[in-house]
């Protein structure tokens, strides 16, 4: 009696794995800023986030959009690239809104003797007062659980998006414009972390930063890089070279995120 061994199509398996990792990355990036937006709202301040961090990141988003346009990607992927710009801009505007609100509060009290001795700079960086929201009542483990569920849903949606865009994907074509835009955006994404690390070091604190924000960024970058690496391209070397800026950009930012995690541990008893 002969036993027929099951046949495995490794190319299909790797393609499905690549799609799953890409969807997981997409799921993380779609909800990435929600924890930090909630943290800022709770504190009524965004002074824990470096302006330069977000501005450089936003410029990187613009080059990412340029790469998407010149790369002839599907309209869905292009819309997601614009979504990243909108979400990052929202976080940046939230920070400046709280600064404007704090400046108005200081200006309205300038006639009070005690407040006359305070500088405007102190007023701008002072939180207006914490807001109690449902997110704040959850433990850190529960917050991770909630965001995990949201990421799962986003991953499922992301898988559908990637599946719809797969027919437009070229696995081994190198286009100069997307490659150049990818190089620039990867460098910007890497450099964006540096002002935040310096800010944390000077303040000797990570208070007001959401650790979930950086966890999602790390998972998103890791899964994104491996989604590229495991894809069974017909010309793997040329394919890898064409995607090298995004691979190096993803892995390099992970190392800086790890250092930020170290800062969370180092400064956790400072506040």
Swiss-Prot record:
Disulfide bonds: none
Transmembrane segments: 17-37, 49-69, 77-97, 144-164, 178-198, 211-231, 245-265
Keyword entries, A-Z: Amino-acid transport, Membrane, Phosphoprotein, Repeat, Transmembrane, Transmembrane helix, Transport, Vacuole
Reaction it catalyzes: L-histidine(out) + L-arginine(in) = L-histidine(in) + L-arginine(out)
UniProt note: phenotype after gene disruption: Increases vacuolar arginine levels and decreases vacuolar lysine and histidine levels.
Function: Amino acid transporter that moves basic amino acids across the vacuolar membrane. Appears to function as an arginine/histidine antiporter.
Record protein name field: Vacuolar arginine/histidine antiporter stm1
Organism: Schizosaccharomyces pombe (strain 972 / ATCC 24843)
């Amino acid at each position: 009696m002969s036993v027929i061994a099951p046949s495995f199509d490794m190319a299909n398996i790797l393609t499905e794995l690549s799609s799953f990792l890409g969807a997981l990355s997409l799921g993380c990036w779609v909800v990435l800023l929600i924890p930090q937006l909630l943290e800022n709202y709770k504190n009524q301040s965004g002074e824990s986030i470096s302006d330069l961090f977000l501005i450089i990141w936003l410029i990187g988003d613009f080059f990412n959009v340029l790469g998407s346009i010149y790369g002839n990607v599907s309209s869905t992927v292009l819309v997601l690239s614009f979504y990243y710009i909108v979400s990052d801009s929202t976080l940046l505007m939230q920070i400046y809104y709280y600064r404007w609100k704090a400046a108005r509060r200081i200006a309205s009290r300038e006639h009070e003797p005690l407040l006359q001795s305070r500088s405007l700079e102190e007023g701008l960086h002072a939180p207006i007062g914490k807001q109690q929201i449902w997110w704040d009542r959850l433990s850190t483990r529960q917050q991770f659980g909630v965001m995990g569920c949201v990421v799962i849903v986003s991953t499922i949606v992301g898988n559908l998006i990637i599946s719809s865009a797969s027919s437009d994907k070229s696995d081994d074509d190198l286009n100069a414009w997307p490659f150049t835009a990818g190089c620039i955006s990867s460098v910007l994404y890497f450099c964006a972390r540096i002002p935040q690390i310096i800010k944390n070091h000077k303040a000797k604190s990570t208070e007001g930063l959401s650790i979930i924000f950086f966890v999602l960024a790390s998972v998103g970058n890791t899964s994104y890089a491996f989604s590229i690496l495991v894809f069974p391209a017909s010309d793997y070397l040329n394919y890898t070279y064409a995607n090298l800026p995004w691979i190096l950009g993803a892995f390099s930012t992970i190392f800086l995120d790890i250092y930020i995690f170290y800062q969370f541990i180092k400064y956790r008893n400072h506040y």
